Structure formats: structure tokens, C-alpha cells
């Protein structure tokens, strides 16, 4: 799946939440979290363009969610991918433990890292270094 994603062969329908998580897990293998974040940021925006999903302030790439999942998965990336996918930090709803939906789905959080407004993350977020 990672190769299909990186090489532009993953369809829009195949780009599910689980596909995002697996891609993130693979990106973290042999890379620092900051390197994985950079790779994923570029690859997701490119993928979105390739499948007709515009990267705007209301759709496409979401920086705060990407930072959240790279950070969460980097804490457990030494585990097999199936265990990572089963982590409570990797569910679709997990970020809502830390952000209100309005803040997380708002334009500022989509375009740049926005710190949580409900509770602090249990780990320091992976940001560009």
C-alpha cells in the first residue's frame, strides 16, 4: 500500500483512515518522526492532487491531524502495524480527546499546527526541526 501511495497508484477510495495509519507507520520505519512528517506532508498533498481532491482551507491535507497521527504512531511504531492500528490513539475519534471538533475542523488547524484546546497531548508534538 505504501508503494502504491508514494507512486500515485492508490485510488481515492483506497485512501481510508486505515490507509493513512499504515502509510504513517511505514513512513516512520527508518526515519525520524520529523522526516516522516515531511514525507507524508508532501506525499499526501501530491496524492490529493492526483485523485482530484483539492488541498484548500476546507478540504484535502490537514496539518494538525497529520502531526497528531505522526506523533501518536511514532510513540508505538516499534510495534507491529496491526498493534499500532489497534491503539486507542489511532482511532478516527482519538484526536477529539484533545481538540473540540470546531477547532480541529477549522481552517487554522487544517493549514498549520494548532495546539489542542481540550487537553494537552500526552507527548510533545512532532514539528519541523
Language-model segments: residues:
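Conserved, aromatic- and glycine-enriched, well-ordered alpha/beta core segments
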Residues: 7-82
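Intrinsically disordered, low-complexity serine/threonine- and proline-rich regulatory segments
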Residues: 1-7
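A charged, amphipathic interaction segment
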Residues: 60-129
Amino acid at each position: 500500500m505504501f508503494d502504491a501511495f508514494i507512486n500515485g497508484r492508490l485510488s481515492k477510495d483506497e485512501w481510508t483512515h486505515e490507509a493513512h495509519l499504515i502509510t504513517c507507520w511505514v513512513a516512520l520505519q527508518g526515519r525520524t518522526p520529523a522526516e516522516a512528517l515531511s514525507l507524508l506532508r508532501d506525499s499526501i498533498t501530491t496524492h490529493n492532487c492526483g485523485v482530484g481532491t483539492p488541498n484548500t482551507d476546507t478540504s484535502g491535507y490537514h496539518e494538525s491531524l497529520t502531526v497528531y497521527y505522526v506523533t501518536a504512531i511514532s510513540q508505538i511504531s516499534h510495534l507491529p502495524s496491526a498493534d499500532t492500528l489497534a491503539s486507542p490513539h489511532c482511532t478516527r475519534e482519538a484526536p477529539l480527546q484533545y481538540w473540540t471538533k470546531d477547532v480541529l475542523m477549522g481552517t487554522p488547524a487544517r493549514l498549520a499546527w494548532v495546539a489542542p484546546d481540550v487537553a494537552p497531548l500526552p507527548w510533545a508534538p512532532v514539528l519541523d526541526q
